[in-house]
């Protein structure tokens, strides 16, 4: 088992810290932004928080790390994807509140502030896959958790992202926990706003 404090030290060395909100996390790791990621979401306006813990116009992917309680550490970790209809992130009750619960129960949690798709569905998917790679220690210089012990958690639109990572990404989580996920695009059953924000003008019957 690779210990959480070893992971944090290695990640901080490899990725550096990013100035960010204080949610009680032990470390804040910048993954990339629109200039360094494989794809851009095309959002040029600065990130905003129009109401507490509701973040919009996200163009920089960041991980907030909550280490497991050492007395209860299981050697497992999760990447948490908050929801928000792919237009904002509800980062409290679908993010760091969950992370604190997992950490208190021996599971290191990393809340992912992923970039909004803005009609570019590949953007949040590449963010979550990179987050998984970091937590698994697959990036140069990082010592992560055993790949078979890194899972993913997602709520609402974040549940859609978690499900996408579990089925479409090259680097897949070992397990998935989905809370009220947006799964179907069928009219009258799925949240249409999430799919409109995810796919933008490219949405059609085939993409649904």
Which residues make up each language-model segment?
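Bacterial N-terminal signal peptides that target proteins for export
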Residues: 1-8
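Alpha-helical structural signal
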Residues: 8-9, 195
């Amino acid at each position: 088992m690779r210990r959480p404090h070893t992971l944090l030290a290695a990640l901080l060395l490899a990725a550096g810290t990013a100035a960010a909100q204080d949610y009680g996390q032990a470390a804040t790791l910048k993954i990339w932004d629109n200039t360094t990621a494989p794809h851009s979401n095309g959002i040029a306006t600065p990130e905003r928080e129009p109401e507490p813990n509701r973040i919009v116009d996200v163009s920089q992917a960041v991980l907030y790390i909550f280490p497991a309680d050492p007395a209860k550490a299981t050697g497992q970790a999760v990447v948490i994807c908050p929801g928000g209809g792919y237009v904002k992130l509800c980062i409290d009750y679908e993010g760091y509140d969950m992370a604190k619960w997992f950490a208190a129960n021996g599971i290191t949690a990393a809340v992912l502030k992923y970039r909004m798709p803005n009609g570019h569905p590949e953007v949040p998917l590449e963010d979550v896959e990179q987050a998984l790679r970091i937590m698994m220690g697959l990036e140069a210089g990082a010592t992560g958790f055993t790949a078979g012990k890194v899972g993913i958690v997602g709520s609402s639109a974040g549940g859609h992202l978690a499900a996408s990572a579990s089925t479409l990404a090259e680097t897949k989580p070992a397990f998935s926990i989905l809370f009220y996920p947006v799964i179907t695009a069928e009219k009258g059953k799925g949240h249409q706003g999430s799919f409109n924000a995810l796919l933008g003008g490219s949405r059609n019957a085939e993409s649904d």
